[in-house]
From Swiss-Prot:
Top-level lineage group: Eukaryota
Cofactor binding remark: P700 is a chlorophyll a/chlorophyll a' dimer, A0 is one or more chlorophyll a, A1 is one or both phylloquinones and FX is a shared 4Fe-4S iron-sulfur center.
Subcellular location: Plastid, Chloroplast thylakoid membrane
Enzyme Commission (EC) number: 1.97.1.12
Family stated for the protein in its record: Belongs to the PsaA/PsaB family.
Gene name for this UniProt entry: psaB
GO cellular component assignments: chloroplast thylakoid membrane; photosystem I
Keyword Electron transport: yes
Source organism per UniProt: Aethionema cordifolium (Lebanon stonecress)
Protein name (Swiss-Prot/TrEMBL): Photosystem I P700 chlorophyll a apoprotein A2
Enzyme's top EC category: oxidoreductase
Length: 734
């Protein structure tokens, strides 16, 4: 008999139903469950797949550069970044005739094009790229890296080049190399690029390979470095009248601590950014030499963990046993990595708008909105994944004997307290926030807006004041004009910071009021509830009150009837599934808040947000309905415009989202009946019955149908909001 899919599971390959296909796809990447898997092959497969992942990333970024160089308007945009719309790529086949061709021919293009809202133009411009040739060079280099990565992946699957398990479990060496190599050396290299290429480009000097060795990045060269006069590198920075990309008003400094923003580009000073990366490089180069390897110096991570005894013995045996537990569990390591990456991605969303690093990106409002939303959603998915793998760790890798009375075991021992406290926090936040919103709604409805309950966020305002915001009149720390910190800050460190924080033209420490207080607590509700579901899913993964024997049922067991008290919605997978809905809702509120607050800021009518955000009808009417009006006006006498594609995507997103419910709110019996009926009709229809199948069609399992439903819900949700966000922002600001 010919080998059937899936080859990695003989049991599944012999399944006579369509379950073989779906279960095969579902477990294709669960290497641990494959036939004949060994620990060594598991590590080697994952290692090789990392090279493939890198190849895809390099190919994708290469494609971005290539298409902009080929079909974009980068060189025109560079001449006038504020008024030329950056083109992402051409549209090959604009349907709907001449009106569509005209609507989408913009940005100085000859034919229909897509506008770029990703910020790549601003990024490439800031780091010193100026011509299409530069972009093509970058694309070719990344294509080369992609090929190298593929070869690397193939090479490390060959017997001679396969690393052994001991190599994968050498935590100290890996940490040293990742800290000093990945973070340290790459940050140092980036500082080098900024100092040698980007900063000269911002001052009108074009440095490439042919003149790299002839152009001094600083008039005094390396002299100050070797003589210890490092402060010379900070002297004579660019002036406030500097025109970015020209020598007009430029200085000679390369490493500064100016603080605040370049007045023309509204982005951080490039010399500050270079200084930051140099500092990061030095920190990580030192950190990468801290752990003991072949040379017998430095720390052993195991010794560190074992030595860490909590004071007074109040936390049992502390970190004893953790080293082997973590080092032998890929899921634990992945959980930690995802948790870190999720937090970092959310911080990227926050900092890309509040402290924009790329020239002129702060004035490209649609790009700002798109980047914030994109990074917050990505962060949400990554963070839920962290808890999913945490749960799988408890099921597959956790050994109670190895972890007796250490912090992990104690988390499990008092999980009821953790879960109930989170539950209480969620209930408190939810009922109080909703109560305030609904009270305010009723007051507005009865025509007595003055009876709203409006709470000033005084603690948050105090924190903003401590950082130097003066408008609240708190007169504390950096906002106190006669304090020593204020006076020192004026001259010694970050002189531009206090100016920037009190200017109303940027997004640093936005002024907040009662509307912000309410939506902050709505978001806190979402965060706590999502966390509650995820934490409970992980801590109950091996056993809970209702079903103490989950270990052998695995991560994603389905509903199992009323036996053992019923197993509906109590597998770790069910918790993940439920948490993703809450995560999406929470990030919805986060992005609504960010977008509405910024739209009113950019339009100069902040009072609209301040007055309408204190009651639910305000959000529904003045944010959602008002801003989607361009997307829901249907066919109008003016025919097509450049927002039409977003109107279509808005509709299509709703369709995909609604399709999710077909899978979420129905049961297997219904589908099995439907499938049997369709199969019966097919077999009795002339011509159609010439097509046969070997696998008996069966309905999806409960878990699979939920996954398909969740996927449609998520994709539709994000599609819909993306169309709304881009259309409503670009419709207002071009």
């Amino acid at each position: 008999m010919a080998l059937r899919f899936p080859r990695f599971s003989q049991g599944l390959a012999q399944d006579p139903t369509t379950r073989r296909i779906w279960f095969g796809i579902a477990t294709a990447h669960d290497f641990e469950s494959h036939d004949d898997i060994t620990e060594e092959r598991l590590y080697q497969n994952i290692f090789a797949s990392h090279f493939g992942q890198l190849a895809i990333i390099f190919l994708w970024t290469s494609g971005n550069l290539f298409h902009v160089a080929w079909q974009g308007n980068f060189e025109t945009w560079v001449q006038d970044p504020l008024h030329v719309r950056p083109i992402a790529h051409a549209i090959w086949d604009p349907h709907f005739g001449q009106p569509a061709v005209e609507a989408f021919t913009r940005g100085g293009a000859l034919g229909p094009v897509n506008i770029a809202y990703s910020g790549v133009y601003q990024w490439w411009y800031t780091i010193g790229l100026r011509t299409n040739e530069d972009l093509y060079t970058g694309a070719l280099f990344l294509l080369f890296l992609s090929a190298i990565s593929l070869i690397g992946g193939w090479l490390h699957l060959q017997p001679k080049w396969k690393p052994r398990v001991s190599w994968f479990k050498n935590a100290e060496s890996r940490l040293n190399h990742h800290l000093s190599g990945l973070f340290g050396v790459s940050s140092l290299a980036w500082t080098g690029h900024l100092v040698h290429v980007a900063i000269p480009a911002s001052r009108g000097e074009y440095v490439r390979w042919n003149n790299l060795l002839n152009v001094l990045p600083h008039p005094q060269g390396l002299g100050p470095l070797f003589t210890g006069q490092w402060n010379l590198y900070a002297q004579n920075p660019d002036s406030s009248s500097h025109l970015f990309g020209t020598s007009q008003g430029s200085g000679t400094a390369i490493l500064t601590l100016l603080g605040g923003f370049h007045p023309q580009t509204q982005s951080l000073w490039l010399t500050d950014i270079a200084h930051h990366h140099l500092a990061i490089a030095i920190l990580f180069l030192i950190a990468g030499h801290m752990y003991r390897t072949n040379f017998g110096i430095g720390h052993s991570i195991k010794d560190l963990l074992e030595a860490h005894i909590p004071p007074g013995g109040r936390l049992g045996r502390g970190h004893k046993g953790l080293y082997d537990t973590i080092n032998n569990s890929i899921h634990f390591q992945l959980g930690l990595a995802l948790a870190s990456l999720g937090v970092i991605t959310s911080l990227v969303a926050q900092h890309m708008y509040s402290l924009p690093a790329y020239a002129f990106i702060a004035q490209d409002f649609t790009t700002q909105a798109a980047l914030y939303t994109h990074h917050q959603y990505i962060a949400g998915f990554i963070m839920t994944g962290a808890f999913a793998h945490g749960a799988i760790f408890f099921i597959r890798d956790y050994n109670p004997e190895q972890n007796e009375d250490n912090v992990l075991a104690r988390m499990l021992d008092h999980k009821e307290a953790i879960i109930s406290h989170l539950s209480w926090a969620s209930l408190f936040l939810g009922f109080h926030t909703l109560g305030l919103y609904v009270h305010n709604d009723v007051m507005l409805a009865f025509g007595t807006p003055e009876k709203q309950i409006l709470i000033e966020p005084i603690f948050a305002q105090w924190i903003q004041s401590a950082h130097g915001k003066t408008s609240y009149g708190f007169d504390v720390l950096l906002s106190s004009t006669n304090g020593p910190a204020f006076n020192a800050g004026r001259s010694i460190w970050l002189p531009g910071w206090l100016n920037a924080i009190n200017e109303n033209s940027n997004s640093l420490f936005l002024t907040i009021g009662p509307g912000d207080f309410l939506v902050h607590h709505a978001i806190a509700l979402g965060l706590h509830t999502t966390t509650l579901i995820l934490v409970k899913g992980a801590l109950d993964a091996r056993g809970s009150k209702l079903m103490p024997d989950k270990k052998d049922f695995g991560y994603s067991f389905p509903c199992d009837g009323p036996g053992r008290g019923g197993t509906c919605d109590i597998s770790a997978w069910d918790a993940f599934y439920l948490a993703v809905f809450w995560m999406l809702n929470t990030i919805g509120w986060v992005t609504f808040y960010w977008h509405w607050k910024h739209i009113t800021l950019w339009q100069g009518n902040v009072s609209q947000f301040n007055e309408s955000s204190t009651y639910l009808m305000g959000w529904l009417r003045d944010y959602l309905w008002l801003n989607s009006s361009q997307l829901i006006n249907g066919y109008n006498p003016f025919g097509m415009n450049s927002l039409s594609v977003w109107a279509w995507m808005f509709l299509f997103g709703h369709l995909v989202w609604a399709t999710g419910f077909m899978f979420l709110i129905s049961w297997r019996g219904y589908w099995q009946e439907l499938i049997e009926t369709l199969a019966w009709a097919h077999e009795r229809t002339p011509l159609a019955n010439l097509i046969r199948w070997k696998d008996k069609p069966v309905a999806l399992s409960i878990v699979q149908a939920r996954l398909v439903g969740l996927a449609h819900f998520s994709v539709g949700y994000i599609f819909t909001y993306a169309a709304f966000l881009i259309a409503s922002t670009s419709g207002k600001f071009g």
